[in-house]
Amino acid sequence: MGVLSNKIDKEQLKPGDHIYSWRQAYVYAHHGICVGEGKVIHFTRGAGQEIGTGTFLDRIIFSSSPAHPSDNPCPRCGDSPRLDGVILSCVDCFLCGGDLYLFEYGVSHALFLVKARGGTCTLAESDPPEDILHRANFLLENGFGVYHAFKNNCEDFAIYCKTGLLVSTSISVGRSGQAASLVAAASAIVSSPLRFLTTSFSGLAAVSYGMYCVSRLVSDIGVRRDIVKVPVERLVANPSF
């Protein structure tokens, strides 16, 4: 892996790794947890399910569904009893023809800001592999709630499996770096009063990018104050947590 790319080979995968693959020309990334033997547990949205956005994101995020239809199952995955929610797939079906990337944990502030695209790393530290795999397998059996693009998506699922951390406030966009980046980008352009301090395009771009970086940083699960550690059994017993 390099500073600007987290791309890895399948041979480098280890159980407990948080992986992702870009969809729709790098518009959106799908995330999951590697559990070994070439399998991935991930949280996905099935066909015909609403996620509450009412926007083009409904069509984009449908790309997180498995690559094989139910009437033509993958020979490695087998005849899966469900194609939405928390599911188990082989790595190839998870990638859906895309490249494989490793999500990084415990990065420095400098590296976090260099990786300007959200949804690739976090300042938060990862738990040991045995804890990660326990959460992922428990949620495979019990579910992770209703998929929502901004508040409960595949990246939220993977980050929870890796850290056990949940957002305790109801006004948040969740743990997802992708969702936080979208909100940060919009806020940087529309909401910042600093944009009135410059009239040049380059000045506006610099101010907007600075606000974007600050918004991303304060939204990261590794620095937020509204984060609590929740055992997976408690999460399943109280899904409205």
Region roles according to the model:
Residues 1-241:
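Cysteine-nucleophile amide-bond enzymes
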